[in-house]
């Protein structure tokens, strides 16, 4: 397969190296188009009013490009960095933190996969809980590439992508592989009011338990729940859902 690899942690991250190198070892043709800077929580932001500065970087077995832009920019630009203008799959990651539950709507990693899926490229976002070691990264990278191979020559529904997450424990401790729904557990935010040395008031996101990511209790069987219990989780995420039929009667006679 011709695989486009991107991420939101930047082209120098250990996660993207593990993922790209796993695809190269499996014999795939790989092109890396990744942000030059850390772009976590950029969601699907694209650049419209400034140029995208691109530098080719050395990478054994692949062509690699550092892009002064967002993860979604990197995906949109990817086909223009190769003469073929076509990819069979897009792998985004490995993100240095899980992307489960509502995090997928903020995540640059997940949004890069969504951007690819919008452009008719089958895609997968790959993430692992913070603190994972090298063996866990390499194991997850290999798993992601083998899972992508299952979809070689197939088309997922447009805008639908695979979201893969793993615990940060040694792979031998992983309890299994589960297809599951997203958790609806939301963040417990705590914005702390402070003053800088010049007396200017600012607010700093400091989670309820001293972390920027404190969560409500996840629902049993959801991705966050299963991750916390030691499972690798997989979800197929699509964007098109509305509740028009549920509320049609309420607004049937509304004329503005």
Where are these regions (language model features)?
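C-terminal accessory domains and tails appended to enzymatic cores
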Residues: 157, 167-256
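Glycine/threonine-rich flexible loop motifs
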Residues: 98-107
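Short, Asp-centered acidic motifs that coordinate Mg2+ and/or phosphate
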Residues: 89
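Short, glycine-/small-residue-rich phosphate/pyrophosphate-handling segment
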Residues: 124-151
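Hydrophobic/aromatic ligand-binding patch that stacks against planar heteroaromatic rings
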Residues: 22, 112-116
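Short glycine-rich anion-binding loops that position phosphate/pyrophosphate groups of nucleotides
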Residues: 9, 38, 70-71, 95-98, ...
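Short beta-strand segments
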Residues: 33-35, 92-95, 126-127, 164-167, ...
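A cross-family phosphate/adenosyl-ligand binding-site feature
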Residues: 3, 13-81, 85-86
